[in-house]
């Protein structure tokens, strides 16, 4: 009898693990696979209730042009309905829902609202919604007033319409928005962010019309803005406690308000737009003058150089200790020399290469301790340019990092 137990034990060893461990294992599986274990036995039906992460995706491989008319099928609805029913009211940590809903398809929209309401009632802390809706899609009131939500992702090409005034997400710290369109883009700050009293990080990735033209929050510490559409003319940043900024956009006519007094680290990637003949980045550059770490893409360098030609006076970067400077054209090196003069504490300078560096431009490297050159081939021409760049008696450490 004992021998038989020893023989069968290993094959059934997983059943002897604590329920909490089995629940964690199930949470690592794809939701559809995890659901399938519920048919094994009554115990596994109970164990499935411990799964704290649900991920649903109605995508069908190879849809191609058919995606324009695709909506989630009845089998997808049955899967989600069955899953949430099996879990009853057990706590849940994360819901990820990616699905296609037709224009004016109130039945499917009601399903989405019901699924979201279910997890909100179970204390969800992270929700990822990627809803392809060819009409307006109003978020459920339960989601917009969820007290436990910490991280929210919304997308893609989602038209939300007018947000209700009662938005209240008291625990939300991380907000990711991918091509989401509001009825009024002032609502991003005036309604959505205003209803998030502890939000710390915002990621905005917009590749369509009507970008938010004002981003305002007293609590935001990290902001990434990636805009890929160039018909806005101005943008304002009212973020007194922001510490990190990653801003990629077309250079605009102006930046009416730039309140970034706490900024420590900034990455700028500003391109020239055909419709903006004379961009003015004066207030933006003044607004980032307190940074300790600054990265300027080659396109940004070109924009700033052009603005300097038409009256931009560079501020003193009193706190700047690390500068990454992109170069494409010979004229950029003159701008680098000007920035170095305005950066009395600069210790680390990072450049892509020395191509195009004019030997007659003198670099004031007095405070710089380390020069990093990302691409360097040690040709005679490069050696000559490097010696000219450093000067005769330079004590700067030159580093060639492996990228």
From Swiss-Prot:
Residues 11-59 form the F-box domain. It comes from Arabidopsis thaliana. PROSITE patterns: FBOX (PS50181). This is F-box/LRR-repeat protein At1g06630. Gene3D superfamilies: 1.20.1280.50, Ribonuclease Inhibitor. LRR repeats lie at residues 239-262, 288-312. InterPro entries: F-box-like_dom_sf, F-box_AtFBL13-like, F-box_dom, FBL60-like, LRR_dom_sf, LRR_FXL15/At3g58940/PEG3-like. Keywords: Leucine-rich repeat, Repeat. SUPFAM superfamilies: F-box domain, L domain-like. It comes from the Eukaryota.
């Amino acid at each position: 009898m004992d021998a038989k137990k020893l023989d069968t034990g290993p094959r059934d060893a997983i059943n002897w693990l604590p329920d909490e461990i089995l629940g964690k294992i199930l949470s690592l599986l794809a939701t559809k696979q995890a659901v399938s274990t519920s048919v094994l036995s009554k115990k596994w039906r109970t164990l499935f209730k411990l799964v704290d992460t649900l991920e649903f995706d109605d995508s069908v491989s190879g849809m191609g042009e058919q995606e324009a008319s695709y909506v989630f099928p009845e089998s997808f609805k049955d899967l989600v309905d069955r899953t949430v029913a099996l879990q009853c009211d057990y706590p849940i940590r994360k819901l990820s829902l990616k699905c296609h809903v037709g224009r004016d398809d109130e039945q499917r929209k009601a399903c989405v609202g019901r699924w979201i309401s279910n997890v909100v009632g179970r204390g969800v802390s992270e929700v990822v919604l990627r809803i392809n809706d060819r009409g307006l899609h109003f978020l459920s009131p339960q989601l917009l007033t969820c007290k436990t939500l910490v991280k929210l992702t919304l997308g893609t090409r989602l038209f939300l319409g007018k947000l209700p005034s009662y938005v209240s997400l008291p625990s939300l710290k991380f907000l990711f928005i991918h091509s989401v369109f509001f009825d009024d883009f002032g609502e991003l700050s005036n309604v959505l962010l205003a209803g998030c009293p502890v939000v710390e990080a915002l990621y905005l990735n917009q590749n369509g019309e009507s970008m938010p033209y004002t981003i305002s929050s007293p609590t935001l510490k990290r902001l990434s803005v990636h805009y890929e559409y160039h018909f806005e003319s101005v943008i304002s940043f009212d973020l007194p406690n922001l510490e990190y900024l990653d801003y990629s956009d077309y250079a605009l006519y102006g930046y009416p308000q730039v309140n970034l007094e706490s900024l420590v680290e900034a990455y700028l990637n500003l391109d020239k737009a055909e419709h903006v003949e004379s961009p003015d980045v004066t207030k933006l550059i003044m607004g980032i003058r307190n940074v300790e770490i600054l990265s300027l893409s080659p396109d940004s360098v070109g924009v700033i150089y052009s603005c300097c030609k038409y009256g931009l006076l560079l501020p003193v970067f009193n706190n700047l200790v690390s500068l990454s400077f992109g170069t494409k054209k010979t004229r950029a090196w003159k701008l680098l020399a000007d920035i170095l003069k305005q950066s009395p504490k600069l210790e680390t300078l990072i450049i892509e290469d020395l191509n195009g560096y004019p030997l007659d431009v003198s670099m004031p490297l007095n405070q710089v301790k380390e020069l990093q050159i990302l691409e360097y081939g040690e040709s005679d021409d490069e050696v000559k340019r490097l010696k000219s760049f450093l000067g005769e008696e330079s004590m700067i450490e030159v580093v060639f990092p492996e990228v």
